[in-house]
Amino acid sequence: MSIHPAVGFARVGNSRDAFYFGPDVVGQLPRGPFKDAKGAMAKQAARFRIYGYDAQGRVLGEVTSAEASIEWRVDVANTKAAWYSIDEAFDIPDSPSVPLRNADVVDRSSLVVHATPRRLRGGGAGPLPLDGGDFAGRAVTLGEVLTDERGRLVVMPGSGEAYSVPGADPLGGFADNDGWTDNTCDGPIRATVRIGGRTLEAEPAWVVCASPNYAPGIPAGLVTLHDSVESALFEAGRMPVGATDFTRDVWPIFERITDLQWVNAGYLDSHGFGSLQDWTQQRWRERLADATTVNEPFRSMVADGFRDPAFTEVQPTLEPQMYGDAVTMPPNLVEPRQWLALTPLQYRHLKAWARGDFTDRRRPVVTRLSDVPLDEQPATLDKASMNACLGGAFHPGVEFPWIARVDWLWTSDLRLRLGSTSPDAGNWGPELTSATALSRRGPLSKLGPGGVTQWMGVPWHADSASCRVGYQKALSLVLPGFWPARIPNHVLSEADYRIVVDTDRTLAERRRAFRTRREWERFIAQPTRPPTLALMVREWFKQGVVRDRPGPTDGRFPSRMKVESDAGYDVEPPTEYGAWMWVPQLPMFPFVVANSNDNSLRSVDRRGRQVPLGLSAALGRPEGITRDGSGNLYVCCLDANIVARVTPTGVVSTFAQGLENPVSITIDGEGNLYVANYTTAGWIAKITPSGDASTLVAPSAGLVQPIGLVMSPDGALLVSNAGPGTVARVDPVSGAVLDPAWIAGLDGPRGMVFDASFHLYLGVRWTNTVNRYDVDGNALPITFTGTALGEPFGVAVDASDRIYVSNSARNVVNRIVVSGDSGVVSDFATGLPNPGGIVFNG
């Protein structure tokens, strides 16, 4: 006797009545409902069955309450708050040690929510609540259990709430927030079967109650949980793998990539409908399946576009364009695991396919379990359950953590090994090391209730609402992504979908609507992380779900479309705060500094070494400088009264003219440039990506000698004014001066920059200082030691939040290493001829 699926997944929801089941066969889409009539989120229930086997392991059939007496036992817990912090997966190189969550709480058991174990017998039993647990004295229910009329077990998950202790800090971290927990959970499922005068103990299963699936219309992510577990067993020599079959082993990779077009705008561009690599087009399907020698160069070219899971080199431009286990924000070009790769087994099949070493046995698509041959039904249930969950990146993950790749944690038939009947309250010392975590005598050997979800973010809302944080202005506002197949990035809205399917509208209008993708988080997204997370806790169930919908019948668009549906908001937000605001422009070396005395642009590497850029034409006193996502530099030429564009190859052209002492320039997320014109009646020009210039802030608006510009995290344009010694806030759309003296009392303010913590650093000329402020313009204390600054002008920040300041009086760029409220200043690049603006150009 065995319980199937071996690992079943439920997903939290706050509806009292609405629920649906996950897939029973691979690729099956849940039917919903995904919201109830009041807008609450439906629960995904996990259903477990028992199958009987003969002595040779052959499947005899499903065992139900009609022919047997079945007693189910369910034991689940949530131990997140008692566990350790989440940094990186412990099974990758150089994973750091992590401290306990809530380390100051002595009674660790008070942080464990352990529901009273439940037993059910027969068909139609229950429901019984999974209650009896509490968090710091507050009762927490983890769901309920019941059986259907045939005696199958149904696990209903919790309500999806987050819980905090009095006085807990607001949510701020994506994975670790002391004083908080949620009501996700996991634990073993066991069953005793009495049949034909015999009493048999079924092979146990595991239930995981996870966060919602916000994209039930997407059947699978590129790397599934089943892929990761199967690959781990294969690499350990515990699972034989046969010859590569295109339809079974290779085609899903391309199908899944194409499906991401509905949840990520970058994949719409690269692999979506109408793109050059829409693999689901029949012509591509046939060519991909072509095993002939003539087609080998094509197959090899496609396969070479995928990242090698050996991770021997950094390959940021390859597929998949998703972040990996070791990602940092901003990502660097040192650690290969900053990006996700296929599993080693997937990659093995891909390489075999590229060589032509594959078959293609196409089988009929099965959509119901009853159509699956009996002997394949148990394994089908197991695979379908795990295939609908993500197998990476484990940072920490959506439904399941990195422990999926620990082969000895699994039986050969994909069951988790139960090691303890008690939850683990983090009794492995004040810090958990990689060696302990991976030890066969470590916590994984004691896997018990709560032992899976404890490795996940707490509460789940924080991680789910942080999945856009990596978008970078300097690279792409849409790629890489984290887990779009379950937590969308960009969606086709209901309103745009209605335009697309309306055949009475013009084709141009419909195409424009089809290409429009809205930020999925737009209803809760704020300029900074904490208020976004707070809104997610309150309104997580209002977020739309991406459902499968019929396309128009005229053949000009996909026949099936995946559409954001049931969003619980009456109107669209007035502003969509781009996720790039959470992390400034990707600051990779080298940086480029403009030098006005010799009209040069000099590239400075991470060691401070300088190389003049080769330019096709001279610049007329370069001052301010910025960069677009394609690597073009835009330079304010003070004497020539123009903005020059410098391509990555050094070709210089006039991008905008008719300016008046242009001295500073910045760029927004849409590629618009803003230029400060340094005059007594100062004004700001706005230049579109196509080069159309207009006056954003007129000379009559009251700006006096504007000299520095930066985009604020809340979307405002900040302008430093040398005349009155102020920083003004400006609406970058209307040009209205929102606050002429947002910061005042400065003696020669100049360049500005925000770091990754949203601290504003402002160079002040005549006091030879760099001031620091919070996002509201409040001064923050900071003191400097080391080399003195000399009339600071340009200010930039690198990936480690080190500040770089050009000093026009000393002809150097200084580096400031900030720690807390102090910074150490040193000369970084010397001998520069009157350095001005700085921009990172890596």
Descriptions of predicted regions:
Residues P590-V593, N632-V635, N672-V675, A716-V719, ...:
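Conserved beta-propeller blade signature
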Residues A617-S630, G658-E670, Y678-A681, S700-G715, ...:
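Beta-rich, blade/repeat-based domains predominating
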Residues M1-M588:
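Aromatic- and Gly/Pro-enriched helix-to-coil junctions and flexible linker segments
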Residues V604-R609, V646-V651, I687-D692, D731-G735, ...:
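Short loop/turn segments that connect beta-strands within beta-propeller blades
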Residues M588-I625, L633-V635, F840-G842:
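An edge-strand/N-cap motif at the start of beta-rich repeat modules
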Residues S596, L638, Y678-T679, A722-G723, ...:
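Short loop/turn segments immediately following the C-termini of beta-strands
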Residues S600-R602, N641-R645, G682-K686, G725-R729, ...:
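A short loop-to-beta-strand structural motif that recurs across blades of beta-propeller domains
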Residues R609-S616, V651-Q657, D692-P699, A736-A744, ...:
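A short beta-strand motif characteristic of beta-propeller blades
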